[in-house]
Amino acid sequence: MLEKTTLKNIILIHFLMFLAVVTAQTAPDEDTSAITRCTAEGTNPVRETDIPNPVNVGTIDDRSCYANYKESTVYGKTWGVYNITFDSNDFDTSLQPRIERSLSRSSETGIGSYARLTGVFRILEVGDTSGTSQDGTYLAQAKGKHTGGGGSPDPAICLYLAKPVYGTGEDADKQVSFDIYAERILYRGGEGDGREIVFLKNVKKDEETNFELEVGFKEDPNDVSKKIQYCNAVIGGDTFNWNIPEPERGTESGIRYGAYRVKGGRAQIRWANTTYQKVENVEVTNPGPIGDVYKLKNVATGQYLSDSGVSASAVIMSDSGEAQNNYWTFVESGSLFNIDNETFGILRAPGAGGPGGAYVVVSTTKEGPSSDGDKVWTIHYNESNDTYRFESGSSGRFMYQEINGNVTHISAMNTDDRSVWKAIAVESLSVDENAILASDVRVFPNPASDSFTISLKTINHVTVNIYDVLGNTIFKSEFNGDTIQIRNKGQFKAGVYLIQLTDKNNNKYHKKLIVK
């Protein structure tokens, strides 16, 4: 009798153990129904369909017609439920299905700016294509736009991809764990071969895994004049830090999470205890070489940037920086600058079909300030060696002296000295030597026609010389007083002229005049 009872107990224990194994393989909130493309419940008129007061942070982006976002309470937590199936994208049908939450982006690039997500995830199932490279589902992604074009208009920087690992024996057809990979760009806008996939770690099915993702900007420890854009993750206590390529092109830091991509089968991901924080620090930059007149010397060649003196013609380089057409000022235009020649107009940075050739920088007769997109520049200052790089707008292209002497604006690393310039103040015009200040002199109207007036604010005795672009003296006179009116009696033809004012201490100031 005892033997029979013992045998029954053994059988019962084995049966209970078997049930425990089955239960462990199926999560309490797992969807075990047949996989279909769409359901009536999951089909919505808009992507923003959500429940009131969801426990997960962020704005829903539901592009799946299989199921809606809902919530479950298991293991002492309330979980956001993200279920998607193959081909269930009812919006933007060329893209992959997803139910994700988008978090407001950190839109500043100053050191200390970041976006940070924390939470806990469980993975129950991911997309399966029978072991191909298309296996898996993204559970989170770092986002961020950049200057200079290339790739998607809203590119992913690093995606965290879960690929299925199948069991053995009776579990050979069951996903029992998941390999987590980082799919990250090799360069800005990288897609396809422009990305690498790096294994991070394995997590078990239905295992509660702590997750933290921070994307932001910090100081480069090797060069305090530069910064790093980073994407750092902590998954289940393991840290995976990565620096994003071309940090100078990054314009923001963002995060999305949920369930995204299923090229076969179904994906089920759960998120709980999500929090989000962002910090936005405005980038502090050198205001640029303003308030004086400069010669711009290319670091690689030692030559000086010169204006051609002809509108829509390519600028040139010269061995000497002493001619008037080598003198430049920087005119503020909002947060950007115009680069203004003392004898002609502001520089233009055309595109591939520019009048001087593809991306060749050309002269204009236009006065600054101008907000025209092809006439504004971002000034990048390197404090460590007192040099500048001039970026056309926010394009990621920099003023560059080519080997053939042409001056273009192209994508170039900051280590390429052909894109690096010295701004050398013209000594005779130095404010430190009591030169006439720019704010002390006005010329109006400018452009002029029949006459123009020179107004002097703090001085009352000057010699006025007016030159044409060839250096010929067109007008010369001495004046006492604070206002000088000059009539055009035919000596000023249509074109650009340089006004030179010299005070009694031999300080000089140059002002440009345009005659229509």
Curated annotation (Swiss-Prot):
Subcellular location: Secreted
Stored SUPFAM superfamilies: Ricin B-like lectins
Induction: By ulvan and rhamnose.
pH-activity profile: Optimum pH is 8.5.
Thermal effects: Optimum temperature is 29.5 degrees Celsius.
Active site, renumbered: K143 (proton acceptor), Y260 (proton donor/acceptor)
Signal peptide feature range: 1-24
Cellular compartments per GO CC: extracellular region
Disulphide linkage map: C38-C65
Protein residues bound to substrate: Y138, E191, G192, D193, G194, R195, Y260, R261, V262, K263
Pfam families associated with the record: Beta-tre_PLH30, PL28, Por_Secre_tail
Location of the region described as Ulvan-binding domain in the Swiss-Prot/TrEMBL record: 289-429
Keyword list, A-Z: Calcium, Disulfide bond, Lyase, Metal-binding, Secreted, Signal
Keyword Transmembrane: no
Required cofactor(s): Ca(2+)
UniProt entry tagged with the keyword Nucleus: no
Positions that bind Ca(2+): G42, N44, D62, S64, A67, N68
InterPro entries recorded: Beta-tre_PLH30, PL28, Ricin_B-like_lectins, Secre_tail
Main location: secreted
Enzyme Commission designation: 4.2.2.-
Gene3D superfamilies, per database record: 2.80.10.50
Protein family membership: Belongs to the polysaccharide lyase 28 family.
Role of this protein: Ulvan lyase involved in ulvan degradation. Ulvan is the main polysaccharide component of the Ulvales (green seaweed) cell wall. It is composed of disaccharide building blocks comprising 3-sulfated rhamnose (Rha3S) linked to D-glucuronic acid (GlcA), L-iduronic acid (IduA), or D-xylose (Xyl). Ulvan lyase catalyzes the endolytic cleavage of the glycosidic bond between Rha3S and the uronic acids GlcA or IduA, producing oligosaccharides that have unsaturated 4-deoxy-L-threo-hex-4-enopyranosiduronic acid (deltaUA) at the non-reducing end.
Domain notes: The ulvan-binding domain binds strongly to ulvan, it does not bind other polymers like alginate, heparin, dextran sulfate or iota carrageenan. Presumably it serves to anchor the enzyme at the substrate, thus improving catalysis. Notably, the catalytic domain alone is more active than the full-length enzyme with the binding domain attached. Possibly, the ulvan-binding domain helps the enzyme to act on ulvan in its insoluble form embedded in the algal cell wall.
Protein name per UniProt: Endo-acting ulvan lyase
